[in-house]
């Protein structure tokens, strides 16, 4: 006779990568059912945004998926710009793509190395945290903050990059690919690593689409869907890069896709730096973008624009729109309803991690208890965006 026992996993558990609580039903060590309990990190973000101006709402997006903040700022900024009917200057577009791809590498490095740590490989984490620190210093030099940058804003960027930062990023990338090769050497053909991930948490193409997957989790199942190619935004259309795709849809394929994406991100950043044009990084519209400090010292009108922008904000035309970007975790979308005032009437956030977490039960059934952290790590879930 089968005896089903219930086991609590989390919400404080080192393999949960956040405040995840799972109610697991086990037959011996085999998972029969898995029920995720969410909401431990709920902060009412969508409601808070309704009480802020469009500029004040921006920092909330940094705090959703706090591992890849600029990707979410990007989605929000593009959504607001679509409502305003403005296009940012070419230099701002190239710089946005550079920092969004740095964000993608930061995210994948953390996921790949902590995932390896979950299954027993410790070294890659220490090697790659040094590389992440260097990339966070690029964030800091551009925006003044290592994590919550608020750098990509509706209308452009907070500021231009300091002189020489583009060359610094380029020289870093030359050495970074060698470090990435070291991680691949340790993990990719490692028999223990493969034993823990191959055929674990398999999803077919049809199932992946039906479950609403996106990003590396979808592409690992063999679906070549990437918003940077299928619905290009900013300057992605003019860049040459491949879309890494898996074949089996298991945890090992998800690891391989993320590793390949980091190499592609390096290619994208190099192309953007080579093509980086001169020019402004904000739109020439003082209702949306602030005037320069120099201009404010000589023009009363510029000073008034600055005061109005940071006290009242700008009024966005009435309407509604949805904009999605290819964030490191998948399709991150922002839906905004504007009533013509300076604050969003409604802001709905589509977080890829929320969709992927729903599939954890399907992926884990009939696997062993020890396989659950391996599957969870392969989905790359951060609870800031899940709970919102």
UniProtKB/Swiss-Prot annotation:
Nucleotide-binding found in the keyword field: no
One GO cellular component, as annotated: plasma membrane
Cysteine pairs bridged by disulfides in the record: none
Recorded GO MF terms: NAD binding; NADH:ubiquinone reductase (non-electrogenic) activity; quinone binding
The EC number(s) this enzyme carries: 7.1.1.-
PROSITE patterns: COMPLEX1_49K (PS00535)
InterPro entries for the chain: NADH_Q_OxRdtase_suD, NADH_UbQ_OxRdtase_49kDa_CS, NDH1_su_D/H, NiFe-Hase_large
Reactions listed under catalytic activity: a quinone + NADH + 5 H(+)(in) = a quinol + NAD(+) + 4 H(+)(out)
Role summary: NDH-1 shuttles electrons from NADH, via FMN and iron-sulfur (Fe-S) centers, to quinones in the respiratory chain. The immediate electron acceptor for the enzyme in this species is believed to be ubiquinone. Couples the redox reaction to proton translocation (for every two electrons transferred, four hydrogen ions are translocated across the cytoplasmic membrane), and thus conserves the redox energy in a proton gradient.
Designated name of the protein: NADH-quinone oxidoreductase subunit D
Source organism (scientific name): Neorickettsia sennetsu (strain ATCC VR-367 / Miyayama)
């Amino acid at each position: 006779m089968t005896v089903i026992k219930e086991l609590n996993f989390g919400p404080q558990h080192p393999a949960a990568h956040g405040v995840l609580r799972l109610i697991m039903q086990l037959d011996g060590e085999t998972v029969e059912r898995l029920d995720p309990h969410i909401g431990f990190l709920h902060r009412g973000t969508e409601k808070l945004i309704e009480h802020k101006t469009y500029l004040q709402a921006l920092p909330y997006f940094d705090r959703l998926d706090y591992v890849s903040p600029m990707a979410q700022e990007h989605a929000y900024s593009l959504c607001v710009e679509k409502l305003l009917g403005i296009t940012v200057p070419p230099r701002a577009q190239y710089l946005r793509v550079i920092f969004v791809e740095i964000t993608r590498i930061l995210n994948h490095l953390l996921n790949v190395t902590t995932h390896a740590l979950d299954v027993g490989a410790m070294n890659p984490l220490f090697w790659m945290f040094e590389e992440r620190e260097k990339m966070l210093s690029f964030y800091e030099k551009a925006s003044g903050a290592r994590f919550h940058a608020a750098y990509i804003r509706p209308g452009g960027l907070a500021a231009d990059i300091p002189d020489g930062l583009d060359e610094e990023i380029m020289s870093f990338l030359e050495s970074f690919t060698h470090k990435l090769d070291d991680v691949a050497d340790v993990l990719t053909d490692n028999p223990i690593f493969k034993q823990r991930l191959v055929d674990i948490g398999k999803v077919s193409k049809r199932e992946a689409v039906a479950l609403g997957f996106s990003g590396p989790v979808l592409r690992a199942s063999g679906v070549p869907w990437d918003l940077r190619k299928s619905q290009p935004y900013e300057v992605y259309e003019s860049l040459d890069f491949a879309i890494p795709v898996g074949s089996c849809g298991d945890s090992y394929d998800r690891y391989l896709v993320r590793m390949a994406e980091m190499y592609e991100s390096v290619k994208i950043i190099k192309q953007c730096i080579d093509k980086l044009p001169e020019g402004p990084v904000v739109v020439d519209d003082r209702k949306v973008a602030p005037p320069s400090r120099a201009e404010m010292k000589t023009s009363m009108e510029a000073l008034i624009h600055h005061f109005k922008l940071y006290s009242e904000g700008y009024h966005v035309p009435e309407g509604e729109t949805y904009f999605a970007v290819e964030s490191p975790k998948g399709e991150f979308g922002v839906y905004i309803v504007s009533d013509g005032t300076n604050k969003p009437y409604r802001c709905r956030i589509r977080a890829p991690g929320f969709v992927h977490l729903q599939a954890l039960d399907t992926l884990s059934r009939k696997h062993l208890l020890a396989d659950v952290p391996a599957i969870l790590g392969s989905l790359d879930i951060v609870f800031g965006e899940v709970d919102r």
